[in-house]
Amino acid sequence: MAIAHLATEYVFSDFLLKEPTEPKFKGLRLELAVDKMVTCIAVGLPLLLISLAFAQEISIGTQISCFSPSSFSWRQAAFVDSYCWAAVQQKNSLQSESGNLPLWLHKFFPYILLLFAILLYLPALFWRFAAAPHLCSDLKFIMEELDKVYNRAIKAAKSARDLDLRDGPGPPGVTENVGQSLWEISESHFKYPIVEQYLKTKKNSSHLIMKYISCRLVTFAVVLLACIYLSYYFSLSSLSDEFLCSIKSGVLRNDSTIPDSFQCKLIAVGIFQLLSLINLLVYALLVPVVIYTLFVPFRQKTDVLKVYEILPTFDVLHFKSEGYNDLSLYNLFLEENISELKSYKCLKVLENIKSNGQGIDPMLLLTNLGMIKMDVIDGKVPMSLQTKGEDQGSQRMDFKDLDLSSETAANNGEKNSRQRLLNSSC
C-alpha cells in the first residue's frame, strides 16, 4: 500500500506545476502580432526610404543643377545652385513650365516621410505607456490564477485517489459510479474561483478597449493621409522637375551682366518618385490590415479558456463577450501569450485524450494512469526491500569471511606450536 501511495505521488507530481525560481511570465507580449507587424512596416519603411534618399544625396553631393553662363566662375555657379535650392519654397523667385507647382515638396520629401514615421509610432508609444503596464499586471494575475485552478484540480484528483486507496475496493455498485463519486470531494479545493469572477467583471469594462480602438483609428487616419500625400506627390513629380530661377535681388537687382533667369533641374526627383511609389503601394496594401485590426476584438474567441472547461466549476460559457469590451481584448492577449501558460499545455493534452478516448473524463483517466503504474511497481521487488536484502546478504558474507579467517588463523597457530615442540624434543 505504501508503494501504491508513492506511485500516485509521482504521477500527480509530474502534472502539478512547480513554482519557478525565476520570475514567472517574464516575456509577456503586450502587443498583438498583427498590430506589431503594422507598426514595424508603417514606421520602418519610411525610415528605410529616408536612409536611401540621404545616401543618394551623399553620393551625388547636390540636389539641384542650374545652367549658368560660361562666363561664370565655379564659385558663381555654386552660388546660383545654392540660391535656387534655397528659393525652391519661394514662389516669387520661381517660374515653372507647368504652372505654379509646389516644388518645395521635392525639397522636403524625406522630412515629410520622417514626419509620417513619427506620427505612426505615436499610437504604439501611447499604448506602451498608457495601457501596457495595467495590461501586464492583469495578464500576470489571470495566468497565475489559471495555473492555480489547474493545480487545485490536480490536488483534488490526488485527494480523491488517496481516499480510494485508503478505503480499499468497494462493492460493484460503487465502482460503477466511480466517475461521479470521484469529484464528490471537499469544496475547499474549488472555493472562490477568483479568476472566473475577475474575468466576468471585464465584460462591463471598456477602458482598455477604448485605448486600443483609439490607437488603431489614429494609425488608420495617418496611413490614409500618407496615401493621399504620396499619390499627390507621385502625380506632381511626373509633371515637371524643371523651373526657372531668378537671382536678381539685393545688390544684384540692377546688374546687367546677370541673366534674368536660370534654367534649373531637381536631380533627386526621379529617385523620390520611385521611393514615393514604393511607399504608396505598401501603405495601400497596409490599409486593409489596419481596418482588420479594428475588428479583431469583435471576434468572440474563447479558445484558451474553453480548455479549462475540463476542470470542475469553471464555466467558459459565461465568458462569451458581446461587442467591444475589455474581455474580448483579454481573450486575444491570452491567446497571444499562450506559450507562457503552462497549465494550458497540460490541459490540451488531457483534452486530446478525452476527444480520442470516447468521452472518458481526463481526470478519471489520470487516476487510472496512476493505478496502472501502481500495479507495475507492485509486480516488481521494491527497491528499498531489495537494497535491504542486499545489505543483509553482504553482512552475512562479511561474517562468513571473518569466521573463515579466524579458523585459518587458529589452524596456523596449532601448526606453529607443534613445530616448536618437535624442535625442542630433537
Swiss-Prot record:
The regions listed as transmembrane in this protein's record are: 41-61, 107-127, 217-237, 278-298
Q: Where is this region: Disordered?
A: 407-426
Q: Which cysteines are joined by disulfide bonds?
A: 66-264, 84-245
Q: Which GO terms describe its cellular component?
A: bleb; endoplasmic reticulum; endoplasmic reticulum membrane; gap junction; plasma membrane; protein-containing complex
**UniProt cross-references to Pfam families, sorted A to Z:** Innexin (PF00876)
Summary of the tissues where the protein is detected: Expressed in the eye, thyroid, prostate, kidney and liver. Abundantly expressed in the CNS, including hippocampus, olfactory bulb, cortex, cerebellum and white matter.
Q: Which residues carry this modification: S-nitrosocysteine?
A: 40, 346
Per the record, residues carrying Phosphotyrosine are: 198
Q: What InterPro entries is this protein classified in?
A: Innexin, Pannexin
Q: How does it assemble?
A: Homoheptameric.
What name does the UniProt record give this protein?
A: Pannexin-1
Which species is this record about?
Answer: Rattus norvegicus (Rat)
